[in-house]
Amino acid sequence: MSKNVLFALTAFSLVACTTTPSEPPKNTEHWATLISKQENLHQVDNKFYRSEQLEAQSEALLNKLNIHTIVNLRFFDRNDDKQAFGHTKINLINTPLLTWSISPEEVADILWQIKQHQKNGAVLVHCYHGADRTGLIVASYRVIYQNWDLNEAKREMQQGPYGYHSVWKNIDNFFTQENMAKIKAELDKRSNTTK
């Protein structure tokens, strides 16, 4: 084989292995607003924030944002919030979700807690990376409380700058009209028992 043919084949192989960077998503002005890239911290609305697991040095930022409650979705290492913020007046709630097995009832419970605690101030929800479980809760919040279209909420979760991991197919598959109806029914039950 001539050197030119070998060179051409090598060059072609290298080009074939490269990927074209995808264009950034469009029409995203209604998505959560970046507050701090370091903490993957975003503002969803005036009383709701999302982030990764925060550390003690984030306390001043939480105070500045008037965050009164942190909802921790982590199943493992659940005490990190207590170690970082246990000395503060921030209300710490632990509602662990197993990434690979999430039920509509669990999501309804978390959304209920978020809504109840928003009466006292802003709420921050997080998991370890602030991407997958957090994304599922934020997308569900968007659909249930903000009346977003299911596909748009899912698009924000998957394509937003939060670090979503597409390996969690069960999270992708969670977003059905049936599951959203189950969440709404569970929330309606809770509303009726507190009246």
PLM region spans:
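Sec-dependent N-terminal signal peptides
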Residues: V5-L14
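Short cysteine clusters
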Residues: C127
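Substrate/cofactor-recognition hotspot
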Residues: G130
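Cys-dependent protein tyrosine phosphatase-like superfamily
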Residues: C17-V123, L136-K195
